[in-house]
């Protein structure tokens, strides 16, 4: 085979490889259809309590706050 013939064969192989690659890319572009789900099914159930009802207590004189105040007062006197 002569050099020009070898070059033509290489070009044909490269063209074939490119067309195969394009075929694979086109398959990736398709979107998969999923069935629609009905999310309202759980609406009939009783609502769950996600957080504690007493999270926003106005009780600032609880045991922790008293201990903290006492600790801070003792630190003030030490310095």
Swiss-Prot record:
InterPro entries: DSS1_SEM1 (IPR007834)
Coiled-coil segments on the chain, per record: none
Keywords: Phosphoprotein, Proteasome
A cellular component annotation (GO) from this entry: nucleoplasm
Basic and acidic residues bias (residue ranges): 1-21
Annotated region described as Disordered, given as residue ranges: 1-30
Top-rank taxon: Eukaryota
Phosphoserine: residues bearing it: 19
GO BP of this protein: double-strand break repair via homologous recombination; mRNA export from nucleus; proteasome assembly; proteasome-mediated ubiquitin-dependent protein catabolic process
Quaternary state and interactors: Part of the 26S proteasome.
Homology family: Belongs to the DSS1/SEM1 family.
PANTHER family cross-referenced by the UniProt entry: 26 PROTEASOME COMPLEX SUBUNIT DSS1, 26S PROTEASOME COMPLEX SUBUNIT SEM1
Primary role: Subunit of the 26S proteasome which plays a role in ubiquitin-dependent proteolysis.
Name of the featured protein: Probable 26S proteasome complex subunit sem1
Gene assigned in the entry: Sem1
């Amino acid at each position: 085979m002569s050099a020009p013939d070898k070059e033509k064969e290489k070009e044909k192989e490269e063209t074939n490889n490119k067309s195969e690659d394009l075929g694979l890319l086109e398959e990736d572009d398709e979107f998969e259809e999923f069935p629609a789900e009905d999310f309202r099914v759980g609406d009939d159930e009783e609502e769950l309590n996600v957080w504690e009802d007493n999270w926003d207590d106005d009780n600032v004189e609880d045991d922790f706050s008293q201990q903290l105040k006492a600790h801070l007062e003792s630190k003030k006197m030490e310095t």
